[in-house]
């Protein structure tokens, strides 16, 4: 099948409100089978529309965003600026398209809107939106929607959801590949040591950004909780090197370049191998505090 372009997306538009959920389900399936059209750098005229549907983020005028931008630097401005200057440093195409001032404005506006603390890593989470979206305002709306609806526990001051995601990654790895799990454990390596950046940023901390965008298409379609399995899938791709290496943390400090197609394929296979109770906690860990209590009790 051809990639998903604007023509295919228009044909999918629901003819009535009753048909909407069916059309969204079809779009999710298309995202899994056929990638969203893009050039080698990940630029796509279709992706913003796909994300708008999958994130349930309809267009909004820019008045709100402009209002927050006009408030100027937030109380977290210095911390934001420190992180903005080192965001996706190896992604030259990103920096040719997205300015530091744009990223800084968006993050400060979010702090003003939500009265929230800025958490390190939010700079990387915001970056794909600024790269892919048609406007800074659209990027802000998508970013806000992601953090508020999909992973609110990831951006608490103590990043509870991220730490629970790391605990679940360990439990999933123990089930899915006991040999790799026990080898890493014998070296004192748990997910809290090597996987927190990949969990918090939904794998966007690993280059190239063009592949991360395709992974985000998949995560927005089926749930950002699947990023935990995407991280395991990335590890499976260089599993033998990890097991053969006397100091595997040397390899885990910098994951190999993303290959979205392979990562998604492995992730889909892994889902069916998890016990239902564990998958249920995985599906809820980024937004449900009650699931967090159960995760904290896991041994």
Swiss-Prot record:
Membrane spanning stretches: none
Keyword Cell cycle found: yes
Occurrences of domain Rab-GAP TBC (ranges): 41-223
GO biological process, one term: negative regulation of septation initiation signaling
Taxonomy, superkingdom: Eukaryota
Key words of the record: Cell cycle, Cytoplasm, Cytoskeleton
Major subcellular site: cytoplasm
InterPro entries: Rab-GAP-TBC_dom, Rab-GAP_TBC_sf
Subcellular compartments: Cytoplasm; Cytoplasm, Cytoskeleton, Microtubule organizing center, Spindle pole body
GO cellular-component term (any): cytosol
Stated family: Belongs to the BUB2 family.
Role summary: Has a dual role in the cell cycle. In mitosis, it is involved in maintenance of cdc2 kinase activity. It is subsequently required for regulation of septum formation. Could be involved in maintenance of cdc2 kinase activity by preventing, directly or indirectly, the degradation of cyclin or the dephosphorylation of 'Thr-167' of cdc2.
Name of the molecule in the record: Cell division control protein 16
Species this chain originates from: Schizosaccharomyces pombe (strain 972 / ATCC 24843)
Gene transcribed to yield this protein: cdc16
